[in-house]
């Protein structure tokens, strides 16, 4: 599968090998790459898809809910890989409902509700002194209420 993806993007053999080793090691998939994909758990399939996505160093990487199904280590590795890709002059566009991650990873954010664009701009401008979750709840007209449980 990974070779097929790299063939599509004409990734040279040497670069392909380096990328596979680096990414498979980072996502702890090295020992599993020769196994049938059908034997993978959901999280392993997600990691494989991410390795494929990063393996050709795209100028623009578009991901839909990339953190779903990942274990905590892979979660951290994905954030690092996204930052690394951006630091090399490329861009990552991803959707997520995990606003804490969006706030920490993104320098720009767009907030969409029911197909309507509520905000698009720098993360620091929308967040200010509040967290992105709080700002989002305010945009929704909802209030964050923390009620203590009886436990």
Regions found by a protein language model. Give the residues of each.
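Helical segment within the ABC ATPase nucleotide-binding domain
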Residues: 76-88
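A short, surface-exposed alpha-helical micro-motif characterized by mixed small hydrophobic
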Residues: 102-104
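Conserved ABC ATPase "signature" region
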Residues: 3, 7, 12-32
């Amino acid at each position: 599968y990974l070779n097929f993806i790299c063939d599509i993007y004409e990734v040279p053999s040497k670069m392909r090998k380096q990328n596979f080793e680096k990414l498979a090691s980072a996502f702890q998939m090295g020992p599993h790459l020769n196994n049938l994909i059908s034997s993978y758990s959901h999280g392993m399939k997600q990691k494989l898809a991410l390795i494929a996505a990063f393996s050709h160093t795209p100028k623009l990487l578009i991901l839909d809910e990339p953190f779903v199904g990942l274990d905590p280590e892979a979660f951290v590795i994905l954030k690092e890989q996204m930052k690394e890709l951006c630091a090399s002059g490329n861009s990552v566009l991803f959707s997520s409902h995990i606003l804490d991650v969006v706030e920490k990873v993104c320098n720009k954010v767009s907030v969409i509700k029911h197909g309507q664009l509520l905000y698009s701009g720098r993360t620091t401008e929308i967040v200010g002194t509040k967290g992105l979750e709080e700002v989002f709840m305010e945009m929704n007209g909802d209030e964050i209420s923390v009620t203590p449980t009886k436990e």
